[in-house]
Amino acid sequence: MTWSDILAEEKQQPYFKQILDFLACESANGKVIFPAKENIFNAFKYTELDNLKVVILGQDPYHNYNQAHGLAFSVQKGVDIPPSLQNIYKELARSIPEFKIPNHGYLVDWAKQGVFLLNTTLTVEAHKANSHKDIGWETFTDTVISKISENKHNVVFMLWGSHARKKKVLIDSSRHLILESTHPSPLSAHRGFLGCNHFVDCNKYLIEKKSQKIDWNLLC
């Protein structure tokens, strides 16, 4: 099974057509939607299903200009690193001595190694967080999470915060490793995310399962 198989099947479903109709209508009415149309499915572009080793779930895309480009927590180069990603870098630096905090938040290197950076809602209206949370995207992304669980083995799922942790019911814990903590947001990072050791535990598990570990360092 490939992403193309899953997308082809879901695109035939009424809910998916409603999503596309909604986005087209909003754009026609002058609404600005992020990420750009060609970037909405970038998580699927950069991480092939065959190569997928890790899933990190986000909620919805960044809602300011020049930030979102289709990968959860990632921003385009030349943009300030968002606070949640700064805390992700802090945890990496705390737990992995050789990790060097980069000067950007562009996470494509992770995605190409098999880290699937999936927002559960794939679009957002400019400057309106969670504005597209009820248009049907979660039906699609829940299906994607379930398909990964059913068709893969030994995937590491990182579930940060209450929204992501609700997706635990979609994952077969007998086939995969589920790592849970609070969200890396400044509001909650100190209540469990900082110190969680997820990136170390992830690589230990991948090595145990005879898989290539993730190099969390990002080229500057």
From Swiss-Prot:
It catalyses: Hydrolyzes single-stranded DNA or mismatched double-stranded DNA and polynucleotides, releasing free uracil. The keyword Protein biosynthesis does not apply. The keyword DNA damage applies. It comes from the Bacteria. Its main location: cytoplasm. GO terms for cellular component: cytoplasm. The active site is at D60. GO terms for biological process: base-excision repair, AP site formation via deaminated base removal. GO terms for molecular function: uracil DNA N-glycosylase activity. Keywords: Cytoplasm, DNA damage, DNA repair, Hydrolase. Its EC number is 3.2.2.27. It is found in: Cytoplasm. Excises uracil residues from the DNA which can arise as a result of misincorporation of dUMP residues by DNA polymerase or due to deamination of cytosine. This is Uracil-DNA glycosylase. It comes from Francisella tularensis subsp. novicida (strain U112).
